[in-house]
């Protein structure tokens, strides 16, 4: 996703669409595990990926990765390192993000596990309840 005002090969004149937080969108849509990491700390990314895969239910993991060929080069980030430095400047651990004033949060993205609901009913389990209710000609009880 290209941030508003930046340009790439597919957004030659710059992105005019508002930047939005995909993790907030997915969390609001009902995902029971939502996380974000960056390529800057591969070990942390790996640990979070394992958590996402082990989580029972819908998991979403957003990874901020450098795109030095298109996004970086076209937006005055002359190297892969410069692109990673930009990613580092807009991301910070959720615990630190939560301590910021609202005005300081604009343009920043928290990293780590952002939502984890271990008690959420997993979709396939819910569907089994629908099938059982259909078989018994009753209303589904969730």
Stretches found by the model and what they are:
Residues 67-142:
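Flexible, low-complexity linker and terminal segments
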Residues 1, 14, 57, 110-114:
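Glycine-centered flexibility motif
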């Amino acid at each position: 996703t290209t941030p508003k005002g930046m340009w790439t090969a597919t957004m030659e004149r710059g992105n005019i669409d508002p930047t939005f937080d995909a993790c907030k969108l997915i969390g609001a849509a009902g995902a029971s595990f939502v996380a974000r990491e960056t390529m800057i700390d591969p070990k942390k990314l790996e640990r979070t990926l394992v958590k996402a895969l082990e989580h029972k239910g819908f998991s979403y993991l957003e990874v901020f990765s450098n795109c030095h060929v298109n996004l970086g080069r076209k937006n005055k980030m002359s190297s892969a390192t410069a692109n990673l430095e930009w990613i580092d400047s807009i991301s910070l651990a959720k615990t630190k993000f939560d301590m910021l004033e609202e005005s300081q949060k604009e343009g920043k993205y928290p990293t780590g596990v952002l939502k984890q609901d271990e008690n959420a009913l997993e979709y396939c389990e819910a569907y089994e309840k629908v099938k059982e209710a259909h078989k018994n000609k009753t209303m589904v009880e969730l």
